[in-house]
Design a protein with these regions (language model features):
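Serine-hydrolase catalytic core
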Residues: 157-245
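Alpha/beta-hydrolase active-site loop
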Residues: 72-94
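Short beta-to-alpha linker loops that shape the active-site pocket of alpha/beta-hydrolase fold enzymes
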Residues: 32, 62, 67-71, 131
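Short, surface-exposed "cap/lid" segments of acyl-processing enzymes
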Residues: 6-59
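A catalytic-pocket lid/entrance helix-loop region that shapes and gates access to the active site
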Residues: 139-161
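Glycine-rich, often proline-containing surface loops adjacent to acidic residues and nearby aromatics
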Residues: 57-67, 105, 183-186
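Structural beta-sheet core signal
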Residues: 28, 101, 187-189
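Primarily recognizes the serine-hydrolase "nucleophile elbow" in alpha/beta-hydrolase
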Residues: 91-92, 97-146
Length: 245
Protein backbone atom coordinates (compact mmCIF):
# COMPACT_ATOMS: atom_id res chain seq x y z
CA UNK A 1 0.00 0.00 0.00
CA UNK A 2 1.51 3.31 -1.13
CA UNK A 3 -0.74 5.61 0.86
CA UNK A 4 -3.88 5.68 2.97
CA UNK A 5 -6.47 8.48 3.19
CA UNK A 6 -8.54 8.57 6.38
CA UNK A 7 -10.80 10.95 8.26
CA UNK A 8 -10.36 12.45 11.75
CA UNK A 9 -13.11 14.79 12.91
CA UNK A 10 -14.36 16.38 9.64
CA UNK A 11 -10.90 16.42 8.06
CA UNK A 12 -9.13 14.17 5.58
CA UNK A 13 -5.60 13.00 6.35
CA UNK A 14 -3.00 11.02 4.39
CA UNK A 15 -0.12 8.75 5.28
CA UNK A 16 2.46 7.86 2.59
CA UNK A 17 4.42 4.63 3.03
CA UNK A 18 7.98 4.11 1.76
CA UNK A 19 9.08 0.83 0.17
CA UNK A 20 11.81 0.31 2.77
CA UNK A 21 10.83 2.08 6.01
CA UNK A 22 13.66 3.52 8.12
CA UNK A 23 11.41 3.75 11.20
CA UNK A 24 11.13 7.55 11.22
CA UNK A 25 8.07 9.67 10.43
CA UNK A 26 7.74 13.15 8.94
CA UNK A 27 4.72 15.25 9.87
CA UNK A 28 4.16 18.06 7.35
CA UNK A 29 1.98 21.13 7.94
CA UNK A 30 1.21 23.08 4.77
CA UNK A 31 0.65 26.67 3.76
CA UNK A 32 -2.45 28.31 2.24
CA UNK A 33 -2.51 26.18 -0.95
CA UNK A 34 -2.35 22.93 1.03
CA UNK A 35 -5.36 20.58 0.91
CA UNK A 36 -6.30 16.93 1.43
CA UNK A 37 -9.48 15.23 0.22
CA UNK A 38 -10.70 11.64 0.04
CA UNK A 39 -8.41 10.65 -2.84
CA UNK A 40 -5.80 13.35 -3.40
CA UNK A 41 -3.73 16.15 -1.83
CA UNK A 42 -1.57 19.15 -2.68
CA UNK A 43 1.49 16.98 -2.02
CA UNK A 44 0.54 14.55 -4.78
CA UNK A 45 -0.77 17.13 -7.27
CA UNK A 46 1.93 19.82 -7.08
CA UNK A 47 5.08 18.86 -9.00
CA UNK A 48 7.53 20.45 -6.52
CA UNK A 49 5.85 18.89 -3.49
CA UNK A 50 5.60 15.51 -5.20
CA UNK A 51 9.36 15.47 -5.86
CA UNK A 52 10.04 16.32 -2.17
CA UNK A 53 7.69 13.54 -1.09
CA UNK A 54 9.39 11.04 -3.42
CA UNK A 55 12.87 11.97 -2.10
CA UNK A 56 11.73 11.39 1.49
CA UNK A 57 9.97 8.11 0.68
CA UNK A 58 13.02 6.88 -1.23
CA UNK A 59 15.08 7.55 1.92
CA UNK A 60 12.65 5.41 3.94
CA UNK A 61 10.54 8.10 5.64
CA UNK A 62 6.83 7.65 6.35
CA UNK A 63 5.13 11.00 5.60
CA UNK A 64 1.77 12.11 6.98
CA UNK A 65 -0.38 15.26 7.12
CA UNK A 66 -3.92 16.61 7.48
CA UNK A 67 -6.19 19.02 5.64
CA UNK A 68 -6.32 20.90 9.00
CA UNK A 69 -9.51 22.86 8.23
CA UNK A 70 -7.91 24.64 5.25
CA UNK A 71 -6.54 28.11 6.05
CA UNK A 72 -6.12 27.53 9.77
CA UNK A 73 -3.59 30.31 10.57
CA UNK A 74 -2.34 28.38 13.61
CA UNK A 75 -5.72 28.12 15.36
CA UNK A 76 -6.05 25.99 18.51
CA UNK A 77 -8.47 23.75 16.61
CA UNK A 78 -5.71 23.00 14.07
CA UNK A 79 -3.17 22.34 16.85
CA UNK A 80 -5.57 19.92 18.60
CA UNK A 81 -6.24 18.03 15.37
CA UNK A 82 -2.50 17.76 14.65
CA UNK A 83 -1.98 16.23 18.10
CA UNK A 84 -4.84 13.79 17.42
CA UNK A 85 -3.30 12.85 14.08
CA UNK A 86 0.07 12.14 15.74
CA UNK A 87 -1.62 9.99 18.42
CA UNK A 88 -3.41 8.07 15.66
CA UNK A 89 -0.10 7.47 13.86
CA UNK A 90 1.63 6.33 17.07
CA UNK A 91 -1.21 3.86 17.77
CA UNK A 92 -1.48 2.46 14.25
CA UNK A 93 2.02 2.53 12.72
CA UNK A 94 5.36 1.01 13.71
CA UNK A 95 7.38 4.24 13.90
CA UNK A 96 9.68 6.03 16.32
CA UNK A 97 7.31 8.21 18.37
CA UNK A 98 9.51 11.30 18.05
CA UNK A 99 8.69 12.77 14.62
CA UNK A 100 10.50 15.13 12.28
CA UNK A 101 8.31 18.11 11.41
CA UNK A 102 8.28 20.17 8.18
CA UNK A 103 6.05 23.26 8.20
CA UNK A 104 5.58 25.81 5.46
CA UNK A 105 4.18 29.37 5.62
CA UNK A 106 1.25 29.53 8.06
CA UNK A 107 1.97 25.89 9.02
CA UNK A 108 4.83 27.26 11.14
CA UNK A 109 2.24 28.83 13.49
CA UNK A 110 0.96 25.34 14.38
CA UNK A 111 4.51 23.97 14.64
CA UNK A 112 5.50 26.71 17.10
CA UNK A 113 2.49 25.93 19.29
CA UNK A 114 3.39 22.22 19.22
CA UNK A 115 6.86 23.13 20.55
CA UNK A 116 5.16 24.35 23.73
CA UNK A 117 3.43 20.98 24.33
CA UNK A 118 5.69 19.22 26.82
CA UNK A 119 4.18 15.80 26.03
CA UNK A 120 4.83 16.17 22.28
CA UNK A 121 8.40 15.44 21.25
CA UNK A 122 9.64 16.94 17.96
CA UNK A 123 12.85 15.27 16.78
CA UNK A 124 13.79 18.14 14.44
CA UNK A 125 11.93 21.05 12.88
CA UNK A 126 12.22 22.41 9.34
CA UNK A 127 10.43 25.67 8.53
CA UNK A 128 10.06 26.75 4.88
CA UNK A 129 9.28 30.46 4.33
CA UNK A 130 7.64 30.47 7.76
CA UNK A 131 5.07 32.86 9.19
CA UNK A 132 6.56 33.19 12.68
CA UNK A 133 4.09 35.67 14.19
CA UNK A 134 0.44 36.42 13.46
CA UNK A 135 0.71 40.02 14.64
CA UNK A 136 3.74 40.66 12.38
CA UNK A 137 1.86 39.10 9.45
CA UNK A 138 -1.15 41.38 10.05
CA UNK A 139 1.13 44.40 10.26
CA UNK A 140 2.78 43.48 6.95
CA UNK A 141 -0.53 42.94 5.15
CA UNK A 142 -1.86 46.36 6.22
CA UNK A 143 0.09 47.86 3.32
CA UNK A 144 -2.28 46.16 0.88
CA UNK A 145 -5.97 46.71 1.67
CA UNK A 146 -7.20 43.79 -0.42
CA UNK A 147 -4.84 41.24 1.17
CA UNK A 148 -5.46 42.65 4.64
CA UNK A 149 -9.25 42.33 4.25
CA UNK A 150 -8.86 38.78 2.96
CA UNK A 151 -6.53 37.85 5.84
CA UNK A 152 -8.94 39.30 8.43
CA UNK A 153 -11.81 37.22 6.98
CA UNK A 154 -9.66 34.06 7.05
CA UNK A 155 -8.57 34.71 10.64
CA UNK A 156 -12.13 35.28 11.84
CA UNK A 157 -13.18 31.98 10.22
CA UNK A 158 -10.17 30.04 11.55
CA UNK A 159 -10.34 31.36 15.13
CA UNK A 160 -14.17 31.52 15.18
CA UNK A 161 -14.13 35.02 16.66
CA UNK A 162 -14.14 38.64 15.48
CA UNK A 163 -10.86 40.35 14.60
CA UNK A 164 -10.91 42.77 17.56
CA UNK A 165 -11.16 39.93 20.09
CA UNK A 166 -8.36 38.12 18.28
CA UNK A 167 -6.17 41.24 18.22
CA UNK A 168 -6.71 41.65 21.97
CA UNK A 169 -5.55 38.09 22.57
CA UNK A 170 -2.48 38.71 20.38
CA UNK A 171 -1.64 41.90 22.23
CA UNK A 172 1.51 41.35 24.24
CA UNK A 173 2.32 38.16 22.32
CA UNK A 174 6.03 38.05 21.56
CA UNK A 175 6.91 38.26 17.86
CA UNK A 176 9.87 36.01 18.70
CA UNK A 177 9.16 32.30 18.17
CA UNK A 178 9.65 30.19 21.30
CA UNK A 179 12.49 27.97 20.08
CA UNK A 180 14.30 25.89 22.71
CA UNK A 181 17.60 24.10 23.24
CA UNK A 182 16.07 20.64 22.80
CA UNK A 183 14.68 20.96 19.27
CA UNK A 184 17.08 21.59 16.38
CA UNK A 185 15.54 23.99 13.82
CA UNK A 186 16.40 24.60 10.17
CA UNK A 187 14.77 27.58 8.46
CA UNK A 188 14.77 27.46 4.65
CA UNK A 189 13.96 30.75 3.02
CA UNK A 190 13.09 30.67 -0.69
CA UNK A 191 13.79 34.13 -2.09
CA UNK A 192 10.93 34.70 -4.52
CA UNK A 193 8.82 37.85 -4.62
CA UNK A 194 8.62 40.99 -2.51
CA UNK A 195 6.90 39.31 0.44
CA UNK A 196 9.65 36.69 0.77
CA UNK A 197 12.32 39.39 0.88
CA UNK A 198 10.43 41.23 3.64
CA UNK A 199 10.16 37.99 5.62
CA UNK A 200 13.88 37.32 5.16
CA UNK A 201 14.76 40.67 6.75
CA UNK A 202 12.58 39.77 9.78
CA UNK A 203 14.38 36.42 10.05
CA UNK A 204 17.79 38.12 9.81
CA UNK A 205 16.88 40.37 12.76
CA UNK A 206 15.62 37.42 14.81
CA UNK A 207 18.69 35.32 14.00
CA UNK A 208 20.87 37.76 15.95
CA UNK A 209 18.77 36.98 19.07
CA UNK A 210 18.88 33.22 18.44
CA UNK A 211 22.65 33.35 18.14
CA UNK A 212 22.90 35.37 21.34
CA UNK A 213 20.79 32.75 23.15
CA UNK A 214 22.89 29.95 21.62
CA UNK A 215 19.79 28.22 20.18
CA UNK A 216 20.19 25.33 17.67
CA UNK A 217 18.75 27.30 14.72
CA UNK A 218 20.32 27.33 11.24
CA UNK A 219 19.12 29.39 8.27
CA UNK A 220 19.51 28.66 4.54
CA UNK A 221 18.57 31.06 1.75
CA UNK A 222 17.55 29.37 -1.50
CA UNK A 223 16.79 30.71 -4.99
CA UNK A 224 13.55 29.32 -6.52
CA UNK A 225 15.46 27.49 -9.28
CA UNK A 226 17.44 25.60 -6.62
CA UNK A 227 14.31 24.33 -4.87
CA UNK A 228 14.92 20.74 -6.01
CA UNK A 229 18.00 20.61 -3.77
CA UNK A 230 15.88 21.34 -0.70
CA UNK A 231 14.65 17.73 -0.37
CA UNK A 232 18.14 16.29 0.09
CA UNK A 233 19.21 19.24 2.32
CA UNK A 234 16.31 18.35 4.62
CA UNK A 235 17.25 14.65 4.63
CA UNK A 236 20.84 15.54 5.66
CA UNK A 237 19.46 17.67 8.49
CA UNK A 238 17.13 14.86 9.66
CA UNK A 239 19.92 12.28 9.68
CA UNK A 240 22.02 14.42 12.00
CA UNK A 241 19.26 14.10 14.58
CA UNK A 242 18.53 10.37 14.38
CA UNK A 243 21.47 9.10 16.45
CA UNK A 244 19.50 9.23 19.70
CA UNK A 245 16.40 7.08 19.36
Amino acid sequence: MESRNFKLDTEWNVIHYPERPNGFGILTIGDERHFVNSSSSFWTQNEGKRSLLNIWKKEGYTVFYSNLYGRHWGSEKAVELTLRLCSHIVRNEILNTSFHLVAEGMGALVALKLLKHSDFKIRSLVLINPVLSLSTQLEQEKENKFFYKKLVAELEAAYETDINTLLESLDGESSRPAFNNDTPVKIIHVLSGNRAYKQSSIIKELSVEWEKDDLPVTISYVLPEKMLQVGSQIVQFFRKHEQVL
